[in-house]
Amino acid sequence: MSSVKRSPKQEIVTQFHCSAAEGDIAKLTGILSHSPSLLNETSENGWTALMYAARNGHPEIVQFLLEKGCDRSIVNKSRQTALDIAVFWGYKHIANLLATAKGGKKPWFLTNEVEECENYFSKTLLDRKSEKRNNADWLLAKESHPATVFILFSDLNPLVTLGGNKESFQQPEVRLCQLNYKDIKDYLAQPEEITLIFLGVELEMKDKLLNYAGEVPREEEDGLVAWFALGIDPIAAEEFKQRHENCYFLHPPMPALLQLKEKEAGVVAQARSVLAWHSRYKFCPTCGNGTKIEEGGYKRVCLKEDCPSLNGVHNTSYPRVDPVVIMQVIHPDGTRCLLGRQKRFPPGMFTCLAGFIEPGETIEDAVRREVEEESGVKVGHVQYVSCQPWPMPSSLMIGCLAVAVSTEIKVDKNEIEDARWFTREQVLDVLTKGKQQAFFVPPSRAIAHQLIKHWIRINPNL
C-alpha cells in the first residue's frame, strides 16, 4: 500500500512532534525558531508537541515548551490534556511541571471582554461619606434630625415589613423598616446598651427635607439625609416588635436576606458586616482590655492608655473583610464545568467551588489551591469576572473563571461531599427549568449563579 503524500506543513508538523517525542531539544528549538506557529499545532489524533513530550518522559522538552507559552489546556481526541497523559504514564516530575506552571496562552474559548456587573449586595442607596465619621458634632446632630433614617437590627437580623400588593399572587416584597428619631430615641439615650453605625447619606436628595424646614434651623441644614444602623439586644427587640405589629426581624440570614430589594440589600450588607465585627471585638485583640466605639462605628479604640494598638494604625482596630475566591472551573475542552456540593447543602444542589484566600497568596494561586484541595483537579489559566459582598458575616466573594489542565476528580471528603463535570446542555436545562432537573444551582442573587451564567454566555455555539 502506498503511503499518503503529506503537504509541506504536515511534514514539518510531524518533524516537530517527532523531535518532542524523541527528546531532541536542538532539533525542536531549530524548527520552532523558524516556525513559531507550530507551538500548539495538533496531529490527526489531536496530540500536541507538549503531549508527545509528556508521553515519552522528557521534562526538559516540557519545560522548554511551557516557557514558550504553549497551551496546556488543549485536549486530544481521547479527551486528555498533557497533564492527564503524564499522570497516566507515571511521570510525576512532568506532571508537577504541568500542574504548577503559570501564565501561558489564554484558552481559545475565553473572551478578552468581561463586562463589569453589579451583583446582589453590591448596589446601595447610600454615599458612605467616610469624611463625616470623625465629625462627632455632625453625627450627633444627624442622630436627632427628623429626616434621618434608622434601620434596626437584633442578633444581626434587620427589621423588615412586607410591601407591595398583599392581594397579588406574587410573593410579597420584603422591605426594610425605615425608622426615625422618635421611634428609637429611647435607645439612643442608653449608648452603652446599643451599637450605632453611621452608614452614609442618601445618594439622591429628598423632597422630604422640605417637610422639616421649620424644625431645623436653616443654617444647620446641609441637605443630607443620613442613615444609621442600630443594634439592640433580643429583649429590647421583642418589646419593639410588640409595639410595631407589622414589622419582624428577618431570619435565618440565608436565604431570607435574598428577599430584599437590591439597593436595600446593599445597605444591609454594609450594616450587618460592621455590626458583626463589633459583636466579636468588644475587647482589644492586642491586650484584652475593653474598647470603645469611634469614627461613626468604624473603629474600636482600646481603653488601656499604654496599649500598643494606640500607637499607629492597626488592622485590629477597624472592621475586617475576609477575601474568598469562588470559581467556575471549566473543562479543558470548554464544553463542561466542574460543580461541587457540601453535606449541608439541600439535596441535589451543586455550586461553584470556593475557599478563603490565605496570607501571602494571590487570587490566582488561591483558586488553583482550593480547586485541587477539594476536587483533585489541576487549574491553569484564571480570569477574574466580578465580586460580591457576602455579609455572613463579612466576606468578599471574588468570582473567577478557572480552566482545568487535568480532568480526573478525586474529592476530599473532608472538604466537600461530591464534585462532577456537567455539560453545557445539562446546565442550560437547570437554568431554564430549575428544580425540575436532577440537580439545581444556587439562586440568581448568588454570585455562583452569575458565574455559571457567565460561562454559558461565552462562546454559546460550542
UniProtKB/Swiss-Prot annotation:
Binds 3 Mg(2+) ions per subunit. One of its GO terms (biological process) is mRNA catabolic process. It is found in: Cytoplasm; Peroxisome; Cytoplasmic granule. It holds the Pfam family NUDIX. mRNA decapping enzyme that specifically removes the nicotinamide adenine dinucleotide (NAD) cap from a subset of mRNAs by hydrolyzing the diphosphate linkage to produce nicotinamide mononucleotide (NMN) and 5' monophosphate mRNA. The NAD-cap is present at the 5'-end of some RNAs; in contrast to the canonical N7 methylguanosine (m7G) cap, the NAD cap promotes mRNA decay. Preferentially acts on NAD-capped transcripts in response to nutrient stress. Also acts on free nicotinamide adenine dinucleotide molecules: hydrolyzes NAD(H) into NMN(H) and AMP, and NADPH into NMNH and 2',5'-ADP. Belongs to the Nudix hydrolase family. NudC subfamily. This is NAD-capped RNA hydrolase NUDT12. It comes from Macaca fascicularis (Crab-eating macaque).
